[in-house]
Amino acid sequence: MAAGVFKSFMRDFFAVKYDEQRNDPQAERLDGNGRLYPNCSSDVWLRSCEREIVDPIEGHHSGHIPKWICGSLLRNGPGSWKVGDMTFGHLFDCSALLHRFAIRNGRVTYQNRFVDTETLRKNRSAQRIVVTEFGTAAVPDPCHSIFDRFAAIFRPDSGTDNSMISIYPFGDQYYTFTETPFMHRINPCTLATEARICTTDFVGVVNHTSHPHVLPSGTVYNLGTTMTRSGPAYTILSFPHGEQMFEDAHVVATLPCRWKLHPGYMHTFGLTDHYFVIVEQPLSVSLTEYIKAQLGGQNLSACLKWFEDRPTLFHLIDRVSGKLVQTYESEAFFYLHIINCFERDGHVVVDICSYRNPEMINCMYLEAIANMQTNPNYATLFRGRPLRFVLPLGTIPPASIAKRGLVKSFSLAGLSAPQVSRTMKHSVSQYADITYMPTNGKQATAGEESPKRDAKRGRYEEENLVNLVTMEGSQAEAFQGTNGIQLRPEMLCDWGCETPRIYYERYMGKNYRYFYAISSDVDAVNPGTLIKVDVWNKSCLTWCEENVYPSEPIFVPSPDPKSEDDGVILASMVLGGLNDRYVGLIVLCAKTMTELGRCDFHTNGPVPKCLHGWFAPNAI
């Protein structure tokens, strides 16, 4: 374990009190002095909703919004940093706020509403933070002894139910998600919270990801963690389509975690026609630190451990038998979102928005966001790239080895190249040099000497390694190593991509061509860029507008689509700077990424930037 790589995760972030005058990012922007990222307005993440908009409001329309679009774009994300005179420490702690853009006959209305969680009620009643979150420790309750705190470890309902990350459908109902076992059913038309579900009541898991997969049949799969006699294990949960999806939930596959005291941190998982794909990164939740945090009143981020010298594992599990088929490994990397997975020509392809390490999570602390303009490392810490890993299936016949290409090196160190000068100071972490090594498919400078093998970083400089990837057109590599098959990815595009979306209903788990994302490069010319990536030819189309910060782009297909990108992109928008009482909806042609129409709303209070959402057809 590398000391210092995850240092800020170990801080006791006890309900930080935020000095708005001292840390106001708008002050430097207005002065025009000392801003390292002059095109990026971090304040869009620091806003708090002061007044809900329960009743839909009308906006100003421009352009042409196709009349065939009928439904509601539902959004979820951080709604408020404040409770009384206290402030949360991390973006993931903020109270969940829902947004709704109702679209019908070319017209749009907007409303927002907080998710009515138990956590929100408790905090508002006490007028202080009384439930511990990811980056914020609760105010100690003097009535609770150490024995009470110990007993709470084994009660699922003692943790936060702040479901502020995503929204997914279960049948004709919609639920908000977080990474605890709680979800909330919401009304897609009024945004009212109708019920709370605890997955633990139906299947024995202690948590689950905030990104389940919804099949065309209506069945939902999710990945959870359970405790067994032999230690923690990952479990694939099935919620069969029907009137009792939760009551009928069951486990279809179980995989032991590689470390008994350190289950991996899981934000999502993958699915193909025949396999579940579990990507086990070396970011783990320390069970011993979790107990210490519960007893000592620390925030939950204190439990995370990053093992930089351990590989990332790719597990393929048979969807029929639930058995492990094969495990592959690559150099350590961090990720939140898998773009898509699919099978092709005897391979499983896994596309991931990848980072060299988990430092980007630290970038979302309140203090880090507020001070980003004076942090020369911020852009590097947040830098990631979409990578493609190709996993060869089956055994490799000896006779075919001579026909395969040779692998010259193996490294993930070339994850990205910065869009700023190479003289820029980098992170003091182990991976501060991620910008100088080539990623496969990105050629090194002529005469540049490759670094020698470094076992701690997982690099390989052995000659004559046999490339096991035979998929036509792929630049990804795999080879037989001493511990199994080693993977080396190819880069899909040289943009930082986050919150990726595809034509989900038709291409989830299938061979696809396009995905859509928002830019994660804070040092870009326009950080608020929407990106369309063609993974076949690795080309990009973009849309951006100065000082506009769009949300995750949602693809909505045309009524009778003739191609994968025949449809529109829907994204909400906020503005950087002083205009925090604005929110809008942009509608783009998915083929060309050009604007079709928009609707602008002026609200009665600040509107924060959101995270994830879902288009609910006919929810009008």
Swiss-Prot record:
Keyword terms: Iron, Metal-binding, Monooxygenase, Oxidoreductase
Needs which cofactor?
Fe(2+)
The cofactor note reads: Binds 1 Fe(2+) ion per subunit.
Span list, region Disordered: 440-459
Q: What is its EC number?
A: 1.13.11.65
Q: What's the name of the protein?
A: Carotenoid isomerooxygenase
Against InterPro entries, the record matches this protein to: Carotenoid_Oase
Q: Which family does it belong to?
A: Belongs to the carotenoid oxygenase family.
Q: In which pathway does it act?
A: Cofactor metabolism; retinol metabolism
Residues annotated as binding Fe cation: H211, H267, H337, H612
Where does this protein come from, organism-wise?
Drosophila melanogaster (Fruit fly)
Signal sequence residues: none
Q: Where is the composition biased (Basic and acidic residues)?
A: 449-459
> What is known to happen upon mutating M471L?
In ninaB(P315); no effect
Report TM segments: none
